Amino acid sequence: MEYKKTLNMPKSGFPMRAGLPKREPEMLRYWQELDLYNELLKKNEGKPLFSLHDGPPFSNGALHMGHALNKALKDFINRSYAMRGYYTPYIPGWDNHGMPIESAIIKQNKLNHKAMSVADFRTACHQFADHYIDVQREGFKRMGVVADWEHPYKTMDPGFEAREVRVFGQMYKNGHIYKGLKPVYWCPHDETALAEAEIEYQDDPCTTVYVKFPMNDDLGKLSHLDKSKLSFVIWTTTIWTLPGNLAIALHPDESYAVVKAPNGELYIMAEALTEKVMGIGGFDSYEIVETHPGSFYENMLASHPFLPKTSRLVLADYVTMDSGTGCVHTAPGFGADDYQTCLRYGMDMVVPVDDQGRHTDYAGKYAGMKTEESNPVILQDMKEAGSLFASQEIVHSYPHCWRCKKPIIFRATPQWFCSVESFKDDAIAACEDVRWVPSWGKDRLRSMVLERTDWCISRQRRWGLPIPVFYCKDCGKPICTDETIDAIANIFEKKGSNAWFEMEAEDMLPEGFTCPHCGKSAGFEKETDTLDGWFDSGSTHYAAMERDQGFWPATMYIEGLDQYRGWFQSSLLVAVGALGRGAPFKECLTHGWTVDGQGRAMHKSLGNGMDPAEIFNKYGADLLRLWAGSSDYHVDVRCSDDIFKQLSQNYLKFRNTAKFCLDNLTGFDPEQLVAAADMQELDRWAVTRLNSLIRRVFDSYDAYEFHAVSHAINDFCEVDLSSFYFDIIKDRLYCDGEHSASRRSAQTALFLILDAMTRMFAPILAFTCEEIWLAMPHRQADDGRSVLFNCMVQPYEDYALPEDAMDRWARIAAVRSAVNGALEQARADKTIGKSLEAEVDVTVPAEDAFLADMDADTLADLLIVSQVRVTVGDALSVTVAPAQGVKCARCWKVLTSVGTVAGHDTLCPRCAAVVKALPVVE
């Protein structure tokens, strides 16, 4: 008889090979037909709310790994909350306005944008943004992200723009917005102001110079010195700013020395820096003639080194003694401190550089030169004029535009500002009510808000939300009132913000409108600047979330580390400054950057980038999700082909674990689970280990430690199941009677394990866990349509073994490990072949004496040998010998009892009984 047919062989039909790139699109179609997102909301309607507000990615390109990491984490969070009984609406969004899109369409389409009408140019930008929204949306959907993809929010949508206009109006009304001439970050390449969040620092080589400013008017205080030889020495790393110099700042309380050099020249510098500066100047010896506090020199005049003008000596507490000369070059058109200092002294603002970064006529012979072009020319002129004290080549950290990557300048221009100082304390206080993950996020954002200057919110761009301000042609004053804001918002709601560029000011204002300042109605002009894109995204919690979903604040914001100075901060400032509320989020979570396998940033120039679309096609989206779910995202997350190959192995461990369970649950009815009292202790051990896993996973989801979830499940599959439990129960599953109590006991444990693991891993391995769920048997209370419609299970406490029993099983596992080692050696020595050919003699120490009392057949099954004898001795030892008896033709155990049942000469009694009970097939 062929006994293989009498075995309960695995037969679920669940494939071992995942084939994710082919199978996942089929699952996406299933979810679409199921209307997964809306069905999930219906399922959890009325339950506690968890609202994750989507930080909007910029719609200017295809997905990259940073997008993928961010959206994967968001999906893990939403799914895990949904499966713990929360109502989880999730509206994805996109940030649409700004310079990156302008630059991209000009470059790609070779547009002469300056020859186009503003409305036509903006229409082209709108179409570009819409295209990449579609591209990114399809990528996110391919990842399996559950969201309301048909109704996203867009910062360029008319409804959003109208709400943002009202945000601006309220902030203006609160007195937090003003227009002024102040130095701001300026990109000459893109000809626009930048916010702090739009700059990044790079190390650049530069020439740093020490420059002599000859004494012009000493106010009679230094008449005893030869004024023709007397100079102040300043230091700067930006040579091009020297034409804009109006003053030299000294610290009022620091000591300044008049230093005589061997060449007879007299130099004024901070006494504390004299040795260092004179050394840089090449002087081995010098004499300090006299010293005075910085305040002594106030209001003296020095001559500019190469322009026909003077520089005033002023005092400033910010002057430090850690670098330079203690005499600080002060150009109010190029620095915030410089500006404030000169303002305090009543000096006029001078900005000798235009929008394109070229010197104006004020700079004399350097007019028309770009700042970087003028550096070597000015340097050479100073050398020839004898005004250069010294120069050095250094590398310093310099700000660059985050979009065009070119160096920027600090330049005073008329701009609109948000006065953060007036509500800074409230914004800082609001941080106290937020849960920060990681916890240091609170201090990071608090310190950034504390140290920040006023927020420059205007941009000299065309693709953006127009600043909703009119100007009176009579008095020239800006106009922003409740009446004008309502009028603009209503027009934008119907026509979009292009109306600003298509309609006359008078047509946008209410009939009979008069200037609130002068009462005239002769005419009005519109502001030409647009709002900073960070004002757009900072308004999303009001303009999109509260409008579309009706709740505020969000439960959570989650974005990359750079958003402390970006979206987190702008959202907080808008919420506090405009709405008078607290933080727009209850929890704030951050993740690191995506880098290559060596920890380097991914760039096209390095050729080290990875494309999510290629990963979908090669490995499948679940592997990308597993990458995100296995990584400690609090630090930079590495990705490479080698990493994905390793993840493929981890994935297969889980898939094969699920397949083993499914294969052996064929015909099993979960409504007839074996009661704990009737289960074999080994099976209860497995469920008790599962309970520990459930608790770890719940704690990890609560802490948003998804890598801990993945690692815990992987370890459980590999250590507890594959290497221990599954090996032991195979004989019972395959060889015991199909409906026997022993087999049903194991199947009960397998069902509980598979059911719990599938639910727990579903937030991360969305496609695979859904595939398992659709293939496995279910209880009547479960929703078989999708694993996502079911809650994660709580520990099965009724099945749990007591602690002393678990301690015994830990000792059994240790003995089994020792037996396995001895079996391996016996195989190597050709003493045995397979482990079932072995008989083992085990000596155990006194603390393991319970093993000697165990049923020998049960212990042999645990050790996967045919025969075992246990004696108590001093230490653990194992001896292996060939088993005595005959090999059973069905289960392959070697037993002396084989053939003792009449009519079954080749079977052991267990197998003979099972075969006898089988129905006779004619």
Task: List each language-model region with its residue ranges.
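N-terminal catalytic cores of NTP/NDP-binding nucleotidyl/phosphoryl-transfer enzymes
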Residues: K42-S103, E164, I234-L242, V314-T341, ...
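Acidic, turn-prone loop/beta-hairpin segments
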Residues: D95, V184, P188, L194-Q202, ...
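Short cysteine-rich clusters marking metal-coordination/redox-active sites
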Residues: C187, C401, C472, C515-C518, ...
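Alpha-helical recognition segments enriched in aromatics with Gly/Pro capping
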Residues: Y345-G357, R461-W463, I485-D636
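Residues immediately within or flanking Cys/His clusters that coordinate Zn2+
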Residues: V184, Y398, I467-V469, G512, ...
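Cys/His-coordinated zinc-binding microdomains
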Residues: E191, Q460, G476, G519, ...
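Residue patterns forming the tRNA-binding/recognition surfaces of aminoacyl-tRNA synthetases
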Residues: E2-L20, E26, Y30-L34, I106-P243, ...
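Protease-associated
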Residues: A247, E254-C327, A336-Q340
